[in-house]
Design a protein with these regions (language model features):
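N-terminal helical cap/lid subdomain that shapes the substrate entry/recognition surface
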Residues: 2-94, 101-102, 113-116
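Residue-level marker of regulatory loop/turn positions in helix-turn-helix DNA-binding domains and
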Residues: 88, 109, 141
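Asp-based, Mg2+/Mn2+-dependent phosphohydrolase catalytic module
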Residues: 1-9, 113-114, 118-203
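Proline-centered loop/turn at the N-terminus of a beta-strand
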Residues: 105-107, 182
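Generic structural signal for small/hydrophobic residues in well-ordered secondary structure
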Residues: 10-13, 53, 99, 108, ...
Length: 203
């Protein structure tokens, strides 16, 4: 069995908090309307289309046509997306720093829209610690599709079984295990740190 010497992270809900409500709770004071908006108008499922590579302006225009009374809030999704990401997950960025200080090669595979990534990436110097990051919206491949893991192995130059992939989504974890990676289903930074210590990647 190969030794695990590389670590591959997901970004949202592993390194950074993410929820559409973080933005829209600032704009929509009525809780019932807020829940309607994030379950029927700007929803995680609709947002996922941008993760998969669909153009943001096309998505927004289509949604505004369908829900014209919400045009301003739909526009805010496009212009204020970084506010859906309030900050890092407790303890996760410290793990990245500790791995980097031990010269463990670091990578990421993230379901993230290309245009939103261009806005978010420069705000977070932690990503300078990573050798490469695969962004779904750029590649037009998304987790848990096997093709995105195949691309990662090829582009990162990794042999199957030599990297552990960390994701909060169970389906993504299962697919990673079926496509060349060891995998950790992320719940919190403490349990992740324990696993990385067990793998001798951290002390």
């Amino acid at each position: 069995m190969p030794k695990i010497t590389n670590v591959v992270f997901d970004v949202g809900k592993v390194l950074f908090e993410w929820d559409l409500r973080h933005l829209f709770a600032k704009l929509i004071t009525d809780k019932g309307e807020l829940e309607y908006f994030v379950t029927h108008v700007v929803t995680p499922e609709w947002h996922f289309q941008h993760d998969a590579g669909r153009a943001l302006d096309e998505m927004v225009a289509e949604r505004v046509a369908e829900f014209p009374k919400y045009a301003a809030w739909i526009a805010a999704y496009a212009s204020r997306f970084n506010e859906t990401i309030p900050g890092p997950i407790t303890g996760s960025l410290e793990i990245v720093q500790d791995l980097a200080e031990r010269d463990v090669p670091l990578y990421a595979i993230t379901n993230f829209g290309a245009e939103f990534w261009d806005d978010f990436r420069p705000t977070q110097p932690i990503f300078d610690r990573f050798q490469d990051i695969i962004v779904s919206g750029v590649e037009k491949l998304v987790k848990p599709e096997p093709a995105i893991y195949a691309l990662a192995l090829q582009r990162f130059g990794l042999e199957p079984g030599t990297a552990i992939f960390i994701d909060d989504n169970h389906d993504n974890v299962i697919s990673a295990r079926e496509n060349g990676f060891a995998a950790h289903h992320f719940k919190d930074a403490d349990s992740l740190r324990r696993e990385l210590i067990a793998l001798d990647l951290l002390h």
